[in-house]
Amino acid sequence: MKIPRTMSTQHPDNVHTPFFTENIELTGEDEVKEAYYVYSHLGCTEQMWDCEGKEVDNYVVKKLLSRYGDYFKEHHLGRDLFLTLRVPNPEIERTEAKILLETLGSIPRSYDVAHHFYNDTYAPIFEIILPMTTSFASIDNIYQYYCDFVIGQQYKRLGGRDLTIAEWIGPFHPDKIRVIPLFEDKDGMLAADTILRRYFQDKDLDYQRVFLARSDPAVNYGQIGAVLLNKIALWRLHLLSEDTGIPVYPIIGAGSAPFRGNLRPDTVRRVTDEYAGAYTFTIQSAFKYDTNLEEAVSAIRYLEEREITPAREIDDTYAISLIERYAAGYQKQIRSLAPLINRVAAYIPSRRKRKLHVGLFGYSRNMGGVSLPRAITVTAALYSIGIPPEVLGLSALTENDREFVLENYRYVTEDLSDACRYLNPDSSFLPDEIKKILPDWIEIDPHSEHRVLSGQIEKAVTACQIDSVQDMIIRAGAIRKFLG
């Protein structure tokens, strides 16, 4: 079975609009074009399809095969290329819960479309991603519901007669689906191996994919906290795979901003080295639309063809205690910036028409009731005012912590240097303790034009001179090659 190495996603972190649409905000129809584009032009082998919000298109398989038939005859959906659905978590997103059932119910319909097109038995959709996974039951419920109700309904008889549903409208395939848990908070990531071990017990699995978030943990626990959580999870999943004999293929949800993963065409080698043990990396919108096309294609080819290195051992006991200390300092600083972040967030342009999935952050008790927008908007707001969020929390680290970070987070200085290209040292909102400690980590060399723009944005927002704020935010994002 081919496992994709790159997963294109619909994260709206891009500044520029893709060439195949005139819409500033991508619509559902645009996202069908986008799926074809990332397969055919960029070389991604997987597209994540977000099944939440009013603009969602449940007929994406039919549209792809009917509109781009020649391409998909040569590149088989479900064998060579993959479409993976991200569904609502009914435990968290109650108003979206029924969409989960609709989405699961659409999988056999998509199978029928592909079967008619290819005349074989490859399912075009056979994996789904469950966000905000926190327990074994949350992923097992989906697996069992699909087997018992979506597939099981075909054996029911109608009105007490001999006619089964399968005899009436045809058989239902595929017989089973694979559920990819997406772990987004500290407790989930630290329990990922335990949750999967339990999930493995009553199933005959030849492999398991698992998705580790990178953006939401950064917003919740800071840059270093997020990286260390990913590394602990990668190491524990490696041990789980060795112990059970079931290959585990981790996915890292990396964006272009250093705070959200620092995955760009020019950083693919160091990011894959940083996250040793990761099999698949997400290709988000800034990577696709804010970079040089040839460089993006070359970088994706590298990601698809590279040799996978095993996860590295990490002292998780010390790492967890460090994360708690660091996160406390980070959260204190971001709480103080929350009013400004929310003010700037109002001017961050939207890049997708649909309602995006909800996040864990914003009603988290450890943030003292402070409400913040989603990770991309938080990142965009802070960069726009010249305070890269990567610097927050550094002052909470001891000297031993710093040595541990330098040893286990290989490219921390490079990530901080990349981020601080967009630092405005003159910002009146930059915490004094950060100004004091930053020179111990890196040499600060801010981008002159971005520094001026961030100062103008800060001044305009604080003075409520809002006419040109969004334009300046877009100009600053264009310099960075990512919005947030």
UniProtKB/Swiss-Prot annotation:
Cofactor(s) in the UniProt record: Mg(2+)
Catalytic activity entry: oxaloacetate + phosphate = phosphoenolpyruvate + hydrogencarbonate
Lineage: superkingdom: Archaea
Transmembrane segments: none
Pfam families tied to this protein: PEPcase_2 (PF14010)
GO molecular function (one): phosphoenolpyruvate carboxylase activity
Coiled-coil zones: none
This protein's UniProt keywords: Carbon dioxide fixation, Lyase, Magnesium
EC id: 4.1.1.31
Keyword Magnesium: yes
GO annotation, biological process: carbon fixation; oxaloacetate metabolic process; tricarboxylic acid cycle
Role according to the record: Catalyzes the irreversible beta-carboxylation of phosphoenolpyruvate (PEP) to form oxaloacetate (OAA), a four-carbon dicarboxylic acid source for the tricarboxylic acid cycle.
Family: Belongs to the PEPCase type 2 family.
Subunit structure as annotated in this protein's UniProt entry: Homotetramer.
Name of this chain's protein: Phosphoenolpyruvate carboxylase
Lineage of origin: Archaea, Methanobacteriati, Methanobacteriota, Stenosarchaea group, Methanomicrobia
